[in-house]
């Protein structure tokens, strides 16, 4: 959290944010992600060209300039319109309309959950998965958008999951990656 007033409540804070550490406000710590051996098998047994994993939810409180949720939705719609057989979407709540990052968006989703609509807003949606690696091992590329952009050093498991599976990530997020 970049809210300095919250940091002052504690004796010490650990953060991934280099700027906070540079100003003596925290200690930079990068949490390790177990990478394992990795897989290099070529692509002959990978039938799916592109996949995207993510939940259909938007971040409230983040300026739209930083929030990549709407860009994720644009990318999904582009593939559905231009290369539908080459793209698969996995995650939660994509059977609902695109989530707005407002209270109104939460209200719309609550109605959609209660009233079964007869439309499929994201035809590429294949459902949720328990094991992301199984899907990545059958895919050549994965769309890897962080939830927000522009925060140096902020990365999540998304990009590591792709690398470990020998999958090529199409990345958008931290500018220093």
Give, region by region, the residue ranges found by the protein language model:
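Nucleotide-sugar donor-binding catalytic core of glycosyltransferases
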Residues: 1-177
């Amino acid at each position: 959290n970049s809210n300095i007033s919250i940091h002052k409540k504690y004796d010490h804070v650990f953060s991934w944010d280099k700027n906070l550490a540079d100003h003596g406000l925290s200690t930079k710590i990068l949490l390790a992600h177990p990478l394992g051996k990795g897989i290099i098998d070529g692509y002959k047994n990978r039938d799916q060209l592109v996949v995207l994993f993510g939940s259909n939810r938007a971040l409230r409180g983040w300026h739209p300039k930083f929030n990549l949720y709407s860009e994720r939705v644009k990318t999904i719609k582009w593939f559905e319109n231009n290369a539908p057989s080459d793209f698969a979407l996995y995650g939660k709540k994509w059977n609902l309309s695109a989530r707005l990052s407002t209270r109104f968006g939460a209200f719309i989703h609550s109605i959609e959950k209660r009233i079964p609509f007869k439309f499929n807003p994201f035809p590429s949606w294949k459902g949720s998965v328990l094991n992301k690696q199984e899907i990545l091992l059958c895919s050549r590329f994965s769309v890897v958008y962080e939830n927000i952009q522009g925060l140096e050093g902020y990365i999540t498991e998304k990009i590591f999951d792709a690398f470990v599976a020998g999958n090529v990530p199409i990345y958008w997020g931290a500018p220093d990656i």
